[in-house]
């Protein structure tokens, strides 16, 4: 079963939430003693995941990949999370 753009974006919400929580100083996702290096790696992984999701598009007319990149659905929360994550990495790298 091919997922819809809406389903793909809904599945990416966890990455948005994690990036925003870390940026806001909420580290409850992590066990005590996690280093800044580990936190940064998680932020980077989630930024990369969101970038892959936002770039999703079919390669040709026969490709069933949903066209997230070309969709007119509001993706601002995802693009904002990417920018927030990148800034966090700059500030805490």
Which residues make up each language-model segment?
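Short, intrinsically disordered N-terminal pre-domain segments
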Residues: 1-25, 90-93
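Short amphipathic alpha-helical heptad-repeat segments
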Residues: 11, 35-51
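Heptad-repeat amphipathic alpha-helical coiled-coil interaction surface used
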Residues: 16, 47, 54, 75, ...
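Soluble, cytosolic/nucleoplasmic coiled-coil alpha-helices used as oligomeric scaffolds and tethers
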Residues: 60, 88-91
């Amino acid at each position: 079963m091919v997922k819809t753009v809406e389903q793909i974006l809904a599945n990416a919400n966890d990455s948005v939430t994690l990036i925003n929580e870390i940026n806001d100083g909420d580290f409850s996702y992590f066990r005590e003693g996690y280093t800044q290096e580990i936190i940064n790696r998680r932020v980077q992984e989630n930024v990369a995941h969101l970038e892959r999701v936002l770039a999703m598009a079919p390669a040709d007319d026969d490709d069933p990949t949903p066209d997230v990149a070309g969709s007119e659905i509001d993706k601002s929360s995802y693009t904002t999370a990417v920018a927030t994550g990148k800034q966090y990495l700059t500030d805490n790298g």
